[in-house]
């Protein structure tokens, strides 16, 4: 893949010195509200959401190559990040319409790539829900939407990270055995679609191609994939794209995510880092809501720091530098 010099420089800012993206994800909005709402009767306030994001940014960005935030609640946290840490900003509205299976994408209406760049972004992230077997007319709309964002990023000469969350229009539960059986195809074929040059994507942020809780040796209940079938799924994922790609943590535990990265590497996946969210900071939410700011800070300085240090240690031996996949032109 050929990158402009400026895009290359921006990507270097969100990566570590080895060319690996060890980024912290805290662009959650709807999901964060739901997490916080478990611990108080009324809806979480803007001030609470902003303050927790600031705490996580202050305490954990010294140990991350960059942080992904949203411009709705995350700009104070962007200002609070470590000066060596890069900044990715999310461009999509949170959530989707649960009354339809189409899950059409939507940008934040008062933002543009130009404005995100002016707010200090080193890269822009957009989340897309995609079913490769879904309604063809819906998928054409989604592809056209991504082309527009790719063109915007090209015009502003800023890296475009596309996050693909796969689903099946006919399966309501992504954690089910039923979805686990089709996940390899859903994830890897979506990556093939969006690796086309026309979309202007620089980095894919993707799911691992199997649900690890159904993999032999990891499963506590039903097994959907043998270890070899799971390893083959990771090899097929590696063959699905020439673009740099990074893994999202999908809300699994820190321990399972780290074990997954080791498994992926052994299988032959040359992934280029992670954008890890809840696996790192989720435990701070309850502490913040029940015990307050300083208790949450203490949790982040102990458990949160341990999570991110352990993840960084795993990345050192499993992730490949994206610099091997790109050249400047």
From Swiss-Prot:
One of its GO terms (biological process) is 6-sulfoquinovose(1-) catabolic process. The keyword Repeat does not apply. Its EC number is 4.1.2.40. Pathway: Carbohydrate metabolism; D-tagatose 6-phosphate degradation; D-glyceraldehyde 3-phosphate and glycerone phosphate from D-tagatose 6-phosphate: step 2/2. Belongs to the aldolase LacD family. HAMAP family: LacD. This is Tagatose 1,6-diphosphate aldolase 2.
